[in-house]
């Protein structure tokens, strides 16, 4: 454990950020899984509705730097193509 006051503070801040980022990442993955579940059932309307909810969340996480913008684009592109194939 850190002995210097500033290092202790940084450790606390780092842990706080880690938990916040993990929470956001988990939430994003949950919405992606909801879209995938709707696709698996073959219900195009439900998949489109779930996609409409998921898309701005993924975009927001990419804008905040939680994930890379290309990863966000890849998720959206792949899910959109799978929905259109239904």
UniProtKB/Swiss-Prot annotation:
Bias kind Basic residues: ranges:
1-22
- Do you know which HAMAP family this protein is assigned to? Ribosomal_bS20 (MF_00500)
Q: Which GO terms describe its cellular component?
A: cytosol; small ribosomal subunit
Organism, by scientific name, is Serratia proteamaculans (strain 568)
Q: Which superkingdom, per the lineage?
A: Bacteria
Note down the stretches annotated as region Disordered.
1-28
Q: Which GO terms describe its molecular function?
A: small ribosomal subunit rRNA binding; structural constituent of ribosome
| Family membership noted in the UniProt record | Belongs to the bacterial ribosomal protein bS20 family.
Can you say what this protein is called? Small ribosomal subunit protein bS20
Q: Which Pfam families match?
A: Ribosomal_S20p (PF01649)
* Keywords in alphabetical order: Ribonucleoprotein, Ribosomal protein, RNA-binding, rRNA-binding
* Function description: Binds directly to 16S ribosomal RNA.
One GO biological-process annotation of the entry reads: translation
Per the record, the gene is rpsT
């Amino acid at each position: 454990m850190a002995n210097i006051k500033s290092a202790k503070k940084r450790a606390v801040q780092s842990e706080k950020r880690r938990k916040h980022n993990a929470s956001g990442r988990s939430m994003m993955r949950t919405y992606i899984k909801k879209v995938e579940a709707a696709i698996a059932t073959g219900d195009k309307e439900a998949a489109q509705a779930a996609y409409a909810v998921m898309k701005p969340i993924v975009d927001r996480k990419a804008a905040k730097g939680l994930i890379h913008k290309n990863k966000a684009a890849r998720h959206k592109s792949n899910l959109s193509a799978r929905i259109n194939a239904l």
